[in-house]
Amino acid sequence: INVKPRGVRQFSNVEHRITVSALSEGGTRCFPDRKIGNAEFKATPDENGVLSFTYDFPLEGEYFIRIFNGDSRILQHNVFAVNEDLAGRIPRIGDLHLHSCRSDGRELPETVAANYRAFGYDFLALTDHHRYYPSLEAIYSYKDVDHALTMVPGEEVHMSRNFVHIISFGGKFSINALIKDTFPTQAEIDNLPRPGVTKEDVAKFALRAINESDCPEQMTHQEFYAKVEELAKTLDIPDCINNDVERFMYAACVWEFNKIREADGLAIFAHPYWISDMFQLSESFTDYMLKQHPFDAFEVLGGERYYEQNGFQTAKYYSTRSEGYDYPIVGSTDSHSSNSENAGAYVARTMVFPFENERKSLINAIKDKYTVAIDGILAEPRLVG
């Protein structure tokens, strides 16, 4: 470990005392004989003003490194020791569920991206209702800008006769656009040009895939219904999903999750405890979905500030975990305005531990459960996972 002051104030050229203490092992005043995770060193600055010592951290977790000159503590740093599973992974903060004015949000896609980068986000996907192209619009808007924000394609998937909200994060083609005569309409596309954005620009991002060659063939609504009904025959759907409407919805969810994976994306089951008159989904439907988990990740924290959504979803997550069901989780704002005066703009986020801040590495890390969902409703963040 090398410690070097960055300012003009340097270490005195005398011997310093350095202590290392593991946060998990209790205070040395109360437990003076507990040696594991606690150590003491003597060091004098070298010709470059650097204090150096060598320590083999015995435990995973947080450590305090404290430096003393005589009896005065002059510096404290926190460091983390990790096991091999976290070695090389860098924590990244982001959002997997956001809206712009292209559906029912307020700001342009590029404004949403800029606002979340200003807040410190490392990655995001714009996931407008029914629409894939706004996420490409956000990416295209910064094609000539050197920036550190990773933007991936995304959409909130709303297929006919399925009222469950599903997020496609990072998919290479649109799931919504697999059905003919769906959003966006030609009139919507025709209205996209504006000052600084030409028709030629629009043609490069108003697409239904990252590369148009990746687009699967479209189908009619009736063809979609037939595919879902055929899939439903192969699923062991229990009696608790007790009518044809719900049975179709569950089968449609499985079909959509499969299609998102076919698009090389991450399939997210979103906010079952969102209150839309009543809870969006019945308790039995939510229970079965979480226990079967045909999705890739559960949006355990979503965009509402009332307790019944995030509180109930968190309780449900820990309850099913205690029963032996395990699945990846994420947290997102589901924000419809990215301006800081919107109280819901930063209510939740996800910390992911990928090897790289890029689409596939983020997806793999989430699938492998290297995530923490962060509730930002209060000043003091609360963590889930």
Sequence positions of predicted segments:
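Charged catalytic cores and adjacent phosphate/nucleic-acid-binding surfaces used
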Residues: 1-91, 161-173, 277-385
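A metal-dependent hydrolase metal-coordination microenvironment
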Residues: 85-266, 270, 300-312, 332-339
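Extracellular glycoside hydrolase catalytic/binding regions
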Residues: 272-274
